C-alpha cells in the first residue's frame, strides 16, 4: 500500500452481477471462512462486497511504502529515473514483505484458523509483486511492478497462491486497464 493513498470507501452495491460466475467460482465455499484485509476502507469494503462479510482479521503486515515525493503524479506519468530518484523501494524490500505475507497467510493464519485457505484482500502493487516473486522474478523493480510490467491485475481480479505447492493462478474479471 502507498502511504497516504486515498483511503476511500467503495459502494457496497457495486458488486457486478457476474463476478461470482467469472471469478468467484474459483474460491470454493469451504475456503471462504478466513478473510484477511489491509486496514484501508477500500479493502475492508471489498471483503463485504464480494463475500458479504467483513474480514475476520485486519493486518498491517501487508505494509506500505512512502511516495509523497511523487506529489499528485500518477505512476504511469513519470519516468523510471524520476521514480527512482523520488522513491526508495529496492526489490529486496519488496521481497522481504512478500516472504512475510506468504508466511503469515500460508502458515500462521491458516494454521490458527484450521483452514486450507486464507483470502487476503490487498493492494495492486503487493499483489503484482507476489505474482512476480512466485513466478521467479523477485528482482523486478518497484517501477516495473507499479506500472504492471509483465503482469496486469485490475480491481475484482483474483490471484490464487498455493503456498504449499508454490503455484499461482490468475483469474481476470475483465480486461486489464492500460494507461497511456
Language model features with spans:
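Short catalytic/ligand-binding loop motif for oxyanion handling, primarily in non-cytosolic enzymes
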Residues: 1, 42-46, 65-68, 127-130
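Beta-strand elements within well-structured catalytic alpha/beta cores of enzymes
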Residues: 1, 36, 112-126
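Active-site-proximal alpha-helix that buttresses catalytic centers in soluble enzyme cores
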Residues: 1-57
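Phosphate-handling substructures
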Residues: 2-11, 50-104
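Acidic, low-complexity terminal tails and accessory targeting/binding regions
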Residues: 10, 26, 57, 64-77, ...
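Generic structural signal for well-ordered alpha-helical scaffold segments
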Residues: 21-28, 99-110
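Active-site catalytic microenvironments for nucleophilic, acid-base chemistry
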Residues: 49, 53, 104, 108, ...
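Short Gly/Pro-enriched loop/turn and capping motifs at secondary-structure junctions
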Residues: 125-128, 136
